[in-house]
Every structure is written in structure tokens, then in C-alpha cells.
Amino acid sequence: MEYKNYTAYQHGSEPAVGVLITNLGTPDAPTKEALRPYLKEFLMDPRVVEPPPARWLWKLILNLIILNTRPAKSAEAYQEVWGKYGDGSPLLDISNRQLMDIEEKVRAHFSGRVEFALGMRYGNPSIASALKSLQDRNVQRLIVVPLYPQYAGATTASTFDAVSAELQQWRWIPELRFVRNYHKHPGYIKALANSIREHQAEHGKPDLLVMSYHGIPQRYFDNGDPYPCECRATSRLVAEELGLNSDEYMVTFQSLFGKEEWVKPYTDATLKSLPDKGVKHLQVICPGFSADCLETIEEIDQENREYFEEAGGEKFSYIPALNDRDDHTTALTQIILQQTRGWPERDGFDAEADKEERALQAKLADQLEKKLSDEFGQ
């Protein structure tokens, strides 16, 4: 492997802590031309689609069939949500606001230099480009915060893969901490409960609260992925915070892809069946999505709303993702602060004394270099 050279080490350069916030990603535009490379990158990730041993067959299906049919359909869906939370993709617009809020809150607890970047697993800005921007700012300690509350191989582990792939090419890697999950973090649970209470204060209490999470193939769970268990743990804690009985809420899984069995129950099939079971007023929240995106805005609030109403449901409302709510970004800040304990740039760090020490070390290094040069030549 060839390592990417940066610059020669400079004595006295000011180091920084880097905070890398990541999420899944988004196409550059709501067009089939932009969707094709985005979907290809996504569906070629072996963490997302674990194909049979004949991987060449999956590549053939992907390139000859899926990438010639799905981009146009996906582009139409993205056009429905584009600009809803800003000028472009909802996920990217919200993620940028989250980053700004987190940065402001985290900086208050750092006396040393701390730098921030946003990276998407697929599309732009990429994780690689975000890491390079942190490298340019002399980041020597790095915390990676994937905004996936529940761990899954297809999301969290894939993020780790992307971070590792870039850092493997660096000659000097930073000290690294990686947030694996936060599905039971008290601040996250309280933020979810607060959002539900606020929604119900305006829209009333439903017959049933559905907590819908992105699904994974049953095969992944059978092979050891803890994701469904962590989804159910989150839901149980939120229900306890709200004082809900077990018959007042349920957990479902959405966004199925392909023909194999995924973890159940499925969100769409569930919503179609609920009116016949007496559920006329339904509220849905998606706790696993840290920001609203195509899967929540279009799939839940539009498509699944129609399923419920066409089956006889009378009142449906979607409870938005936590997005850039203050209690959400506060919870994420708490997670970052907990994970960076012990780093010298944190609270109590004497930045001026550190600057003086670095200047002294640089001066001594220059003196030594001059002495060696005088004695031994170039």
C-alpha cells in the first residue's frame, strides 16, 4: 500500500481534536443521473447487501437491471421531498444544522482546539473528504459519531469500514474513538419522549403509537446483528418514559428491499391491517432516523399514510424525527463529551501554557537541527 504523504512534521504546530459527524447520505440532485452513482455506491457495499458466494451474479443484477430501472423511480420520490427542510436534500440540510448546533455546544467544553466535519457514507460530502479536511486542520485526536442510535452492520459497521479505509492510507493516524450506538442513552430517550408528548399535546392521544425502524434481512439478525433487539430496547425505554402499556404501542420495520425475509412485523403490512383491529387514530414515529429523509417523509408520511387511510383508518399523523431539536443536539453533545473524557483539550486545559510549551519545543528542535547541521553538514 502506498501511504498518502501530507507534510513534514512541524514542531510547535497546534494539534486539534476532530469531531466527525456521519450519516447515511443523499444523492447530489433528485435526478436519475444523480441517483445512479449514489445507488451503485450504496448497493455495492457488502455490509448493505451480503450477496451469495457468487458475488459476480449480484453485480450483474445490479448493473443490468436495478441501476437501469430504480434510479428514475427513486428520483421521482426525491423530487417530492427535495427542499422541504432547506434548499436541497432534507437529510443533508438537517445534518448541517445539527452539526452547527453540536459544534456550538461542544466548543463550550473545550479549552483546546476542536474541529468539526460532516461526512456521508454514500454521496457527498464523503467520509473520506471530511477526514481529509480534519487532517488539513492538524487533527490528532478523532471521535467519530455515526448518527445511528441503534447499531447495525449495514450502517454503523459500514461507517467504521469507510473511516478505516481512509485512515489506512495515512502515514500518521490520529488517536481514535468511535461511538458504536446510543440506543439507551437517557438524553436520547428523553428527547424522543418529549417530541411525542409535544405532538400529542397538539394532535391528541392516538389509539396506537407505532415506532417504525428501518428493517434488515432476517438473515443478518440470525447471524448475530443485534439491531432489532436494540430497536426494541429503545422503544421499551421510550414507552416507560411515557408511561405506556404494552398494548398502547408497537414496534415495526420498514423499507424492505429484495425478496428475502426481513425482520418482522413489517410497517406497511401492519398499517394496512390496523383499521380492521379497531385502530382508527394512529401516530407513527421513526426513532432510528436521526434526521428526516426520504424514508420518513415519503415512505411513512405519504405512502404508509395512504395504506392506513385506504384500509379504513380515520386519523394518521407522523411525528417528525428529532432533527435539530435542542434536546436532541444536547443529547448528542453529552455523548461526545462522555466519549472524550481524559483528552487534554477538554475542560481545564491551559491553552496558553500549551502554546508556550509547543513554542519552546519547536525552538529546541530548531537549535538541535542547527547544531547537527553544523557538526555533520547537510
UniProtKB/Swiss-Prot annotation:
GO terms assigned for molecular function: ferrochelatase activity; metal ion binding
CDD domains given in the database record: Ferrochelatase_C, Ferrochelatase_N
Pathway the protein acts in: Porphyrin-containing compound metabolism; protoheme biosynthesis; protoheme from protoporphyrin-IX: step 1/1
Record key words, sorted: Cytoplasm, Heme biosynthesis, Iron, Lyase, Metal-binding, Porphyrin biosynthesis
Residue numbers binding Fe cation: H214, E295
GO cellular component, one term: cytoplasm
Alphabetical list of SUPFAM superfamilies matching this protein: Chelatase
Coiled-coil regions listed: none
Similarity comment: family membership: Belongs to the ferrochelatase family.
Name of the protein in its database record: Ferrochelatase
Gene: hemH
